[in-house]
Amino acid sequence: MAEEGPPEPSIDFVPALCFVPRGVAKDRPDKIVLTQAELARIIGDTQQELDEESDDDAEEGENAEEDQNDMDVDDHADANSENRDPQDEFQFQEYDNEANANVTSLANIVDAGEQIPDEDEDSEAEDEVIKPSDNLILVGHVQDDAASMEVWVFNQEEEALYTHHDFLLPSFPLCIEWMNHDAGSEKAGNMCAIGCMDPIITVWDLDIQDAIEPTFKLGSKGSRKQNKEQYGHKDAVLDLSWNTNFEHILASGSVDQTVILWDMDEGQPHTTITAFGKQIQSLEFHPQEAQSILTGCADGYVRLFDCRDAEGVNSSSIEWKVDGEVEKVLWHPTQTDYFIVGTNDGTLHYADKRSPGQLLWSVKAHNEEISGVCFNNQKPNLLTSTSTEGTLKVWNFDGTEAKHVYEHEFNMGRLQCMRQCPEDPYTLAFGGEKPPRCAIFNIKNSIAVRRTFGIPDAE
């Protein structure tokens, strides 16, 4: 009888990924050697946070038990339904309830000494060196109850793709945003913000290879026991957008039905937008107008806010209504009055910010929800879309219609995300739920794409 190997993970997929531009990463990321005191502090802080959450959860449970006596059974069921995470297709409520396991994992890793670099290691190994021609790809990976960020190296010229290093995350990642703003430093950084099932946004320095805690966090759950005030989001963070014009500002959208504009230099919310009927699933700052942010909500509304007046921002929006839930919104990078909207029924809508409430065209692009959209800054009439049905499609569009050009089936199960290489808009990265789970694809490989958009054949 053949020996049985380890069981296959029941959950294994890539829910989020992000490109890092070439030339911004250190050629050799710093490796941190922790002292025993620093190690004890990190483990102690983590354990304290979990103890505080456990105490608060217990107190909330006692209060809920008292309140239950005053409720109808039907009302109680409705409340549970409302509190259930709408993104929880893989039952990650159970994953969050197992948070205590992460502390044990953290302690074991540190005790094993695997985070401490050996002086005898060959630091000149080629794969360790990040070249100016390399892109990094930040890959959020979920495997059963473990969540991690994998930092991949992608070199287009050499056709190389490999994992450089990874680090543990405190919760299941939902969105990743790269930014070069290093809070507290006058120099440009190499940072990323991660939104998770947990309401706290973590910000990591990508030039530090062995980090076991983020550089800083945005938000606090608060603690009655420690008399700590709650601030920031109260539920999962579904999307992030960095303001490239005001580089200290990061926007986040949440299941708690708010958008927060964070001042990263202060580590505090600057503006909170509450004009939503359901969770915010997508948002993006305008590429040129720093005060404008576009949001997509599960209530079927796309809203454009002027954020210059923090007090009046909730009444400043203009709106577009579509059928279904808004899954994606994206500004056109060169024709910046226009934007695309993707919904949970697989429809794409194109609109002009100067025409509130009007849609220029709509097309039933996919049979399932839109999980990614990308414009092309070299070909302004080229649009790509992906869906959880597992396909990539390429569209040729103008102000009146979109025509299907090409499609590709990845056989990776449900495609969860798609992002575009900053230096080559034809090269796209995808995250899915079946091997290889992360894939790179260049749409110029398609003859139909080259012919339609006048792209020369490769030599």
UniProtKB/Swiss-Prot annotation:
Bias kind Acidic residues: ranges: 48-73
Transmembrane segments: none
WD repeats: 168-214, 232-272, 275-315, 321-361, 365-405
A biological process from GO: regulation of gene expression
Sites of Phosphoserine modification: S385
Source taxonomy: Eukaryota, Metazoa, Ecdysozoa, Arthropoda, Hexapoda
Keyword Zinc: no
A Pfam family per the record: WD40
Principal location listed in the UniProt entry: nucleus
UniProt entry tagged with the keyword Transcription regulation: yes
Designated gene of the protein: nclb
Record family assignment: Belongs to the WD repeat PWP1 family.
Protein known as: Periodic tryptophan protein 1 homolog
Record keywords, A-Z: Chromosome, Nucleus, Phosphoprotein, Repeat, Ribosome biogenesis, Transcription, Transcription regulation, WD repeat
Protein function: Chromatin-associated factor that regulates transcription. Regulates Pol I-mediated rRNA biogenesis and, probably, Pol III-mediated transcription. Regulates the localization to the nucleolus of Cdk7, a regulator of the Pol I-elongation factor TFIIH. Acts as a regulator of cell proliferation and tissue growth as part of the TORC1 and Myc signaling pathway in response to nutrients. Required in males for both germline stem cell (GSC) maintenance and early stages of germ cell differentiation of germ cell cysts.
Quaternary structure (record): Interacts with Mybbp1A.
